[in-house]
From Swiss-Prot:
The keyword Membrane applies. Residues 1-14, 902-927, 1471-1482 have a biased composition (Polar residues). Residues 503-515, 705-719, 1501-1511, 1518-1529, 1750-1759, 1833-1844 have a biased composition (Low complexity). Pfam families: DEP, DEPDC5_CTD, IML1, IML1_N_fung. Signal peptide: none annotated. Keywords: Membrane, Vacuole. It comes from Mycosarcoma maydis. Belongs to the IML1 family. This is Vacuolar membrane-associated protein IML1. Residues 1-48, 469-532, 681-765, 878-969, 1459-1488, 1500-1551, 1736-1761, 1819-1867 are annotated as: Disordered. It is found in: Vacuole membrane.
Length: 1867
């Protein structure tokens, strides 16, 4: 096939621009050009290969077959010709979890540099043209030897905008995410591609988007946004059991059935399809409201909301942190819970008098005489959603503690039967918003209903409007608090730039805006404002939190979705519940819609439809009935055509008279405010607050708002019937009968002389008031009078809403229900006029005023062509007077409204006169202090009107009977003067109105939202969305269920766009700068040295990585398409250029000086490098806080898993404290100015591990000398191996430093931690160990002068005695060995002492030679020289002389343990009741003085193993066995407990800390280091603790290191268990949904006084039986209670908590922890969630890595190992045993009997020790006699195995309690 040439236009034939395939196809083949065309496409033969067999690269291209003039940076596209692709169904797709839906047009894009990198492969296959991996071929339908088309494409067309990466079974930090993305930059990726980062992070490429379209491959540039999704997250599923959950949906399905049979199964199906490995928690929650009469029956945490309702919140945990739960059982439990939930929380059991009921009767499900139903489950709207969110966030506040290395992310899904609208507390909403945004956590809200017509999610709360004086005070207070902890400020002006600020809506809001001149430019968000005037009534606001993703799951099985199907949205539950035949015969009571009446303040029809010469009518002011004569007065003088037109318009207007004209959005409403219309922005109250003479109305529901009566009766008359006032909202839900009764009441108030009139229909053409539009009418009538009592104000209750954007703060939506105040306006008219005077004056006044006002126009009006009539109508001051009049009633709604009626004798002239006076007397808003005084007589003329407003008498005010009418000239003169003053005041206010508009319109846009018409350019919401904006590759479909978010939750994006302006930073943020100097010698353990990286660049990268790890985001440049307020608009190019971080972090770009910006909710960090000073400058901007950040205390009832019922839980919700992080110290630590030491304030990620003896026997092992080792010896070797692993992992800066240090071994001991501190020998060893570490450098210098080769034995012995080798008396299992040293110490000493000993292996060889030469010997002569805890001593000829040892110092101080008298399969138990080793039947010999042999039974399975080998007779050869006791144990237990007195406590450090390198293979480009804290002492029978703390190290390296240690230790019979750091008693403080299970004892243990004398002296008698019981079930000591330590010693641990209230045990399998309470309280049980959650993931991973792991796991199961799934079985078994009194009694008796045997054996051993010490026997004879007596005392116990003649029987006091045979007999 010949190459094809692309013929294109002349403008596209240059080398720099290549034509694509589509251009070639659409171009004309006949076009020509003088230049030679560029070849951009050619056919090519495609091969496939399987990496890494032929090549490690996925694409290999032969350059000879590529396109000409191909550059390495070019992009190539590989496609198959049409018709040659394999069928889609036959394409063997890859893994199901990343299957990509490739179409037939899918193309594969790759870089030329990627394809031509493997030259060796091309050289071996010269005929190769192009080859792709089989994975690519399968995904794209390619096949071997296929003919393909290779095309050159441009980067612009294939640059990826968003790419998704999926990962599972690993914890991926944000720093690792950024590094993964950096590795992908400047490469091409495809869907399904596997991505790795230095072998640590493994991810899979998911969806790829280019220009919001999904593609299969593309090019990753610096502007590409990466989306990281986790398939193994901590998943919380909350199900709200509100009242609606038991209701029926329209399709007849109950909502909880829809959840159980629809949503949850679908979610599980999608989980399995991925597949995911989430750790799941399922919680049911509800709120129950109680009446006040029911409070006395409740005992729970009763709370009261803002409305005074009493309630209790309930939570029940169904699934608790399970990774592989049985979903069949879970679904069954959920179904049962829906039936039992109400029963559990609504039925209250109460005691009654009479005899006690039987046990069965008390546990009956329903006892009519003993239970009472109380409370009602709340609706979803009133539920406890925010409380549940905060309870779930409490564990996440300390997410860095107990870090799960296999989980990433937190996902919360809330399932509700509501519509997404919730009534919440303001402070709780604020703290929830801050915590959600600070933690970078999202939430999915799934509603089972249809989507409502308003925006969701929607939170309704109450708040005060900011007061100007309070704003200034809060600003000052914020600056004073700038040095302290600062939260997300709501300072003035910060409403625009608050990321995380919800969009808000207010009703009744205009009255809360204070004077403009004293208010800051941008008042704070009401959500972030706390008023200091709590007496004021709060307004209603709405918030749309953008941290909630709302979905609607409303699938109907019988009605599949169709786009053309009508879906009803208004739910009428009574109608839905009707039967089919009930529609015509059933009555339904539907409340009336609360609408705002059409009055003169808001009427548009009265002005839109009237001609200019038509004056205002009085028809809106007289009461009903009215006669035709009065009705036709307004039509006098008009032509019949005009009369008919007005009549039609009256009718139309009457139809819509109840509907506010603001219901429809008006884009010019904003312009009206600029021209003087106040509306919500230009509130009359704002102006009137500055007006002298105004006084506050004390009876108003809104305490600080002047009560006004606007428009007199015109604005107060109820719609529908002009004479019938509308009652308050609480009284408006009347039937027709109620309305008629109200009408009759109105008629009764009329004058008796009024002629009767029939009832008028509702829609009468004569009902419409032809009044002058109120737009030009002044509002000076608001001025109140204090001379007369006021009438009752009208009532107002509304659900008013306000538009954002189109109508700033104007009432829309549901209108107000207004009830007029009595006597309005009637008394204002003191004169009567004739009709002609009224008509002329009214028309003239209307035209003049309207013209004067409409002439004041905004420049924006000029652009609105075709709307001049609308502008002219709306340019007056309507809105202000409308708002004023609408708010003139009683806001409490508690006062009734007296209906207003007009006396029948009132004439039309009087009514129109009143209207004219009202219009002329109060049109302007005098807010300026320099105001022209009112015209004389103006106030007097309107005094009657003003007095009406303040009148308190409910009776109508009578008009004076004798009043002389004034002349027409006087009337016109007065009207002209009033109009002149009106126009003058209007002009004065215009400038002020425009200024107000500029700020308040902006505020309204940014803080208020209309749920029914939300704005798309809300800045407050945009700044919050910017934190998550890069997570959305394209516009979301609000109708679709967000399954991807609920299946694979996304992590917080790494980049954001939000950056405040310079002025905002100066005004609303506090600055905290610091500088870090950089030099060429900069060195830190957090920096990896590299010759190619400048030190400043390395420090800068680490600073950025550590901030990313703490939740910060890079601030990146915004694209031109970004509409929101972003960094593109806020960066000043004069100072710097905001660039992509990946560009700035590259070599060569550091010297530009451009800063890197990183931000979190309340902080912004600006990091830049100053080349002139060689310093990195950091500026931290912390947002000021103007609101209270006090924590919120909360109480509720929670039913944790495995507990019998609800428990009262107290929780505290705390604001995030990101400002307290010590960034200055961290930056100094990165730069190397601070030593590497652990600092708690840096919030290290941390995890704890416990090393315990495993349940099975370790694999058989032989010493290098050939002898077999017993279980304890093997485990001691394992602990030494762990010390060696720690030594190898330590961080060293040089090779010499690594060679000079020696392995620091642990101090083995057979005592418990508390008892070891009373052992002088142990304390001496501890001091020597610390001294050895300090003197290590000095020993290294001495080493240079000595060699062991050719050195005489005498010289070596002198070196041993004086050269640093520890030779002293040692205790093991309560037996003293004098003048001994261990093999491990000997090896370490030789490595340090002699220069020719370079390794421990060489030291072992030299030790064997020295032992063979007779320098030293084993204490029992049973072992050769071994590197471990084996006791040796110099032979007598080399031992030298030592002073008296004081053998009698411990003769009577301590007794040994007792011998077990039963089977050999009993575990070894020491003086405190503990045993060492594992369950093996073999007899254990000495491991250098360890006179130990034991046999542990499997705790749960109860199996018994027999001994297969014997070490009998080892101790009979011992030559120097001294039975003595440590001097520190001479005091009694009472002494121990009371020691210390007033003495100063001695500090003892029982742990060691070091820095380890978890990347020994140097795979990472960073310094992967961590802090390791481990115990110093180790008892093989107890748990050994160590913790790992790290900052921004890749967690995968830490996990790999721990897993490597685990596999190594398993060969020595040891198990490494991941454990929680704190004690299990306090787990509820960290996670409120978790609680330990209490296991009580049915029979208390014997009193310590009964067995104290029989215990070995120095042994604590407390909890002896509890310890023995736990060890019987396979538990080992993890942490000992702090109270058991000596009082005169202050212990310090860095490897474990310093304080434990109760002793804590861990099971050998690692599945559970138990704390000992003591007495009848028994124990606390808690499953080990950390260990159990890893079982499934680790087993899958290790089976994949090493097939031997599966075989080993199978062997452990055959040996009876307890798996994680059996934790509950073990708990139930322990519970059964503790609840059986007979079993406990038998157990106690056996323990007491063994104590008697202990006392007998101890007396024999003490006597023998005394005789030997006195020198009665010779050494050999004494040893033989001792061996003989020991063998005799154990003959009974040896009968079962015959292998324990060498064991001191006193060491096995309670071993018989753990045998498998006894466990079976007990069962």
């Amino acid at each position: 096939m010949a190459p094809q040439f692309a013929s294109s236009r002349a403008t596209s034939l240059s080398v720099d621009r290549f034509s694509t395939a589509s251009d070639r196809r659409h171009s004309s083949s006949s076009s020509t050009h003088q230049q030679r065309p560029q070849i951009n496409e050619r056919p090519i033969t495609l091969w496939t290969h399987d990496p890494p067999n032929f090549s490690r690269n996925e694409v290999v291209l032969n350059p000879e077959y590529s396109l000409p003039r191909l550059a390495e940076s070019d992009l190539l596209q590989l496609t198959l010709p049409a018709g040659s692709r394999l069928p889609h169904n036959s394409i063997p797709f890859g893994p199901k979890d990343r299957r990509c839906k490739f179409s037939t047009k899918a193309t594969f894009v790759f870089r030329a540099a990627q394809a031509t990198a493997d030259a060796d492969f091309v050289a071996r296959q010269p005929q190769l043209q192009i080859s792709v991996s089989k994975n690519i071929a399968n995904n794209y339908g390619f096949y071997n030897r296929a003919e393909a088309i290779l095309t050159r494409v441009t980067k612009d067309d294939f640059t990826i905008d968003h790419v998704e990466l999926y990962f599972r079974d690993q914890y991926v930090g944000r720093a690792e995410m950024w590094r993964v993305f950096q590795n992908l930059e400047d490469t091409c990726v495809y869907c399904g591609q596997k991505v790795t980062l230095a072998g640590s992070v493994r991810a899979t490429i998911g969806r790829i988007f280019i220009k919001e379209k999904k593609v299969t491959s593309g090019y990753v540039s610096a502007s590409t946004k990466a989306i990281f999704r986790s398939e193994s997250a901590k998943y919380n599923l909350f199900i709200q059991l509100s009242r609606e959950m038991w209701e029926f949906d329209e399709d007849g399905e109950i909502y909880y059935e829809k959840a159980l049979q629809g949503f949850i199964p679908e979610l599980l199906r999608r989980w399995r399809a991925v597949p995911t490995n989430h750790i799941l928690t399922v919680i049911l929650f509800a709120r129950v409201h109680y009446d006040e009469s029911e409070i006395h029956m409740l005992e729970g945490p009763i709370r009261q909301d803002a409305r005074g309702k009493y309630y209790i919140d309930y939570y029940k945990v169904v699934v608790d942190l399970e990774s592989n739960c049985n979903w069949d059982a879970v679904m069954t439990t959920l179904k049962e819970e829906f039936f039992r939930f109400q029963h559990d929380i609504l039925l209250i059991r109460r005691p009654i008098s009479g005899p006690a009921a039987s046990h069965e009767e008390l546990h009956a499900d329903l006892i009519r005489d003993r239970v009472h139903m109380a409370g009602r489950i709340s609706s979803s709207y009133e539920g406890n959603l925010l409380e549940a969110i905060n309870l779930a966030l409490n564990p996440f506040d300390e997410h860095y503690i107990d870090r799960d290395l296999n989980r990433t992310g937190l996902s919360m899904v809330f399932l509700t039967a509501g519509t997404g609208h919730f009534d919440v507390d303001k402070k709780l909403l604020r703290i929830t918003t801050e915590r959600m945004i600070e933690n970078g956590t999202g939430l999915d809200l799934v509603c089972l209903t249809k989507m409502p017509l308003h925006s969701v999610p929607l939170f309704h709360f109450k708040s005060h409007y900011p007061d100007p004086s309070e704003l200034k005070q809060s600003q000052a207070a914020a600056h004073n608090r700038s040095q302290r902890r600062t939260g997300p400020g709501a300072g003035p002006g910060m409403t625009v730039h608050r990321p995380g600020q919800p969009a808000l809506l207010s009703r009744h809001s205009s009255s809360r805006l204070a004077a403009v001149n004293s208010t800051p430019a941008n008042p704070p968000d009401p959500l972030y404002f706390d008023s200091r005037k709590p007496v004021e009534e709060e307004d209603d606001f709405y918030s749309m939190p953008h941290w909630i993703d709302c979905s609607f799951y409303n699938l109907q099985q019988d009605k599949p979705f169709r786009a053309d199907r009508f879906v009803p949205r208004c739910k009428m539950y009574d109608v839905q519940m009707m039967g089919f035949m009930e529609n015509q015969i059933s009555d339904i009571a539907i409340p009336y819609l609360d609408l705002k009446p059409v009055n003169k303040a808001s009427s548009l029809h009265s002005s839109f439809y009237l001609p200019r010469h038509v004056g205002p009518s009085s028809s809106g002011f007289h009461s009903e009935p009215r006669n035709s004569e009065v009705s036709d007065l307004a039509l006098v003088g008009l032509s019949p055509k005009q009369q008919r037109r007005i009549a039609r318009e009256r009718f139309d207007a009457d139809v819509f008279r109840n509907v506010s004209p603001y219901l429809k959005p008006n884009p010019y409403r904003l312009l009206n405010a600029a021209a003087g219309t106040s509306g919500f922005i230009d509130s009359p109250v704002t102006s009137d607050m500055h007006r002298p003479g105004l006084r506050r109305n004390p009876s108003s529901g809104y305490g600080g708002i002047p009560t006004t009566n606007a428009n007199s009766a015109a604005s107060s008359i109820s719609p529908g019937k002009a004479g019938a006032s509308r009652p308050p909202v609480q009284q408006t839900r009347l039937s027709k009968l109620g309305r008629e009764a109200s009408l009759r009441e109105d008629e009764a108030d009329q004058d008796a002389s009024a002629p009767p009139s029939p009832e008028k229909p509702r829609f009468n053409v004569l009902d419409e008031p032809l009044a002058r539009p109120p737009l030009a009418r002044p509002i000076s009538h608001i001025v109140t009078s204090t001379t007369k009592p006021k009438s009752r104000a009208g009532s107002i209750r509304s659900v008013n809403t306000f538009s954002r954007g189109f109508m700033p703060m104007e009432p829309i939506g549901k209108a107000m229900a207004i009830v007029a105040s009595t006597d309005a306006l009637l008394s204002a008219t003191s004169h009567t006029f004739d009709e002609q005077e009224l008509d002329a004056a009214a028309a003239k006044q209307y035209n003049e005023a309207d013209d004067s006002v409409s002439s004041l126009r905004s420049p924006a009006q000029l652009k609105a062509k075709g709307y001049s009539w609308l502008w002219k109508t709306l340019t007056g001051s309507t809105s202000s007077r409308s708002a004023s009049s609408e708010r003139s009633g009683d806001f409490d709604g508690g006062q009734g409204a007296k209906d207003f009626s007009t006396p029948a004798t009132r004439s039309m002239q009087e009514v129109l006169s009143a209207q004219l006076r009202q219009q002329a007397g109060g049109s302007s808003k005098p807010t300026s202090p320099a105001r022209r005084p009112p015209i004389p007589g103006r106030m007097s003329r309107t005094s009657s009107l003003l007095s009406v407003h303040e009148a308190s008498s409910p009776a109508p005010i009578k008009i004076p009977a004798q009043q002389t009418p004034r002349s027409r000239q006087e009337l016109e003169t007065e009207a002209k003067l009033l109009r002149d003053q009106e126009a003058y005041e209007q002009q004065l206010e215009e400038e002020e109105a425009r200024q107000r508009y500029a700020q308040r319109a902006q505020v309204e846009k940014q803080t208020l939202v209309n749920p029914s018409n939300p704005s798309k350019n809300l800045k407050g919401a945009a700044t919050q969305l910017l934190r998550w904006q890069h997570l959305f590759p394209r516009r979301l479909n609000h109708h679709a269920v967000k399954w991807r978010s609920m299946t694979t939750p996304a992590c917080l994006p790494l980049t954001t766009l939000y950056l405040p302006t310079e002025s905002d930073l100066a005004a609303m943020w506090s600055e905290h700068p610091h500088t870090t100097s950089i030099s060429a010698e900069t060195a830190s353990f957090l920096l990896k040295k590299s010759s190619s990286t400048h030190p400043a660049l390395a420090v800068l990268r680490e600073m950025a990585y550590h901030r990313l790890a703490q939740g910060y985001q890079f601030i990146v440049p915004a694209s031109k398409q970004t509409r929101a307020v972003s960094s593109r608009k806020l960066v000043d190019p004069k100072h710097f250029t905001l660039r992509w971080p990946s560009e700035l972090l590259q070599p060569g770009n550091l010297a530009t000086g451009n800063p890197i910006f990183l931000s979190v909710t309340n902080q912004i960090h600006r990091i830049s490098y100053d080349r002139s000073t060689s310093a990195i400058n950091v500026k931290r901007y912390v947002r000021n806080t103007n609101y209270s950040t006090d924590p919120i205390d909360y109480e509720c009832c929670i039913w944790p898993r495995h507990l019998p019922g609800y428990q009262t839980v107290k929780a505290r919700f705390v604001y995030p404290d990101s400002a307290s992080y010590n960034w200055t110290y961290l930056d100094s630590l990165i730069a190397g100015y601070v030593d590497e030491k652990f600092v708690e304030s840096l919030r290290y990620w941390r995890t704890r591990f416990v090393l315990v003896p495993s349940e099975g026997s370790p694999p058989p092992m032989r010493a290098p000398t050939g002898e077999d080792l017993n279980d304890e010896e093997i485990r001691l070797i394992g602990t030494d191996k762990l010390a060696e692993l720690f030594h190898r992992a330590r961080f060293v800066r040089s090779k010499e430093e690594r060679e000079q240090t020696h392995v620091q071994r642990f101090l083995p001991t057979s005592l418990d931690p508390a008892m070891s501190l009373q052992d002088d020998d142990f304390m001496k060893q501890l001091a020597e160990e610390n001294a050895k570490q300090r003197a290590q450098s000095a020993s290294s210098k001495k080493r240079l002068n000595k060699t062991i080769s050719g050195r005489a034995l005498e010289a070596v012995s002198r070196d041993m005695r004086s050269g640093g080798l520890v030779i002293n008396d040692r205790i093991w299992h309560r037996m003293l060995y004098s003048d001994t040293f261990t093999g491990a110490d000997m090896v370490s000493w030789m490595c340090i002492e002699y220069t020719d000993v370079r390794s421990r292996e060489e030291a072992v060889d030299w030790g064997i030679r020295l032992m063979q030469d007779g320098l030293f010997e084993h204490v029992h002569k049973s072992h050769g020289f071994l590197d471990g805890h084996y006791f040796y001593r110099l032979k007598s000829e080399y031992a030298g002389t030592r002073g008296p040892k004081g053998w009698f110092r411990g003769t009577d101080s301590q007794r040994g343990s007792f011998a077990e008298k039963e089977s050999l399969s009993r575990p070894l138990v020491h003086s405190s009741g503990q045993y060492a080793g594992s369950n093996t039947g073999e007899t254990r010999g000495v491991s250098g003085g360890e006179v130990v042999s034991e046999k542990n039974a499997v705790a749960v399975a109860g199996t018994t193993s027999t001994s297969s080998r014997s070490s009998a007779g080892r101790h009979s050869r011992s030559s120097s066995l001294h039975l003595a006791h440590p001097p520190s144990l001479t005091m009694s237990s009472s002494h121990t407990a009371g020691g210390g007195g007033g003495k100063k406590k001695k500090k003892v450090q029982l742990s060691r800390s070091l820095v380890i390198d978890v990347d020994p293979g140097r795979r990472s480009d960073r310094a992967e280091v961590a802090f390791l804290h481990h115990d110093i002492a180790h008892n093989p029978a107890n748990g050994f603790n160590f913790q790992i703390h790290w900052l921004s190290t890749s967690a995968r390296f830490i996990e790999d290191a721990v897993q490597s240690w685990t596999r190594t230790l398993e060969r020595y019979g040891l198990r490494l268990i991941e454990a929680p750091i704190g004690q299990i008693k306090d787990v509820s403080l960290h996670n409120p949904f978790q609680a330990p299970v209490q296991i009580e004892l049915s029979l208390p243990p014997p009193s310590p006084a009964t067995y104290r004398s029989k215990l070995p002296r120095g042994t604590l008698p407390e909890l002896w039986f509890e310890y023995a019981l736990l060890r019987r079930f396979g538990f080992v000591l993890d942490q000992e209670a702090s109270a058991r330590y000596p009082k005169d010693v202050e212990i310090t641990y860095s490897s474990r908590p310093n304080t434990f209230e109760f002793s804590q045990f861990v099971h050998r399998s690692g599945v559970a922890f138990v704390q000992v309470l003591g007495g009848l309280d028994g124990f606390l049980w808690l499953n080990n969630r950390l260990y159990n959650s890893h079982t499934h993931a680790l087993s899958q991973r290790h089976q994949h890595r090493d097939p031997r792991h599966a075989q080993q796991q199978q062997q452990q199961q055959q040996q009876g190992v307890v798996e994680a799934a059996e934790a509950d079985k073990l708990r139930l078994e322990l519970t059964r045993f503790c609840s059986d009194r007979d079993e406990l009694e038998r157990f106690y008796r056996r323990v007491l009997a063994q104590l008697l045997q202990v006392e007998k054996e101890e007396s024999e051993r003490d006597e023998l020790a005394k005789e030997y010490a006195r020198g009665i026997f010779q050494q050999a004879a004494g040893e033989d006699e001792l061996s003989r007596r020991q063998a005799k005392s154990r003959q009974g116990s040896n009968s079962s195995s015959g292998t324990s003649a060498d064991r001191p029987g006193a060491l096995y006091a309670l071993s018989q309690l753990s045998t498998g045979s006894e466990r079976k007999s007990d069962a």
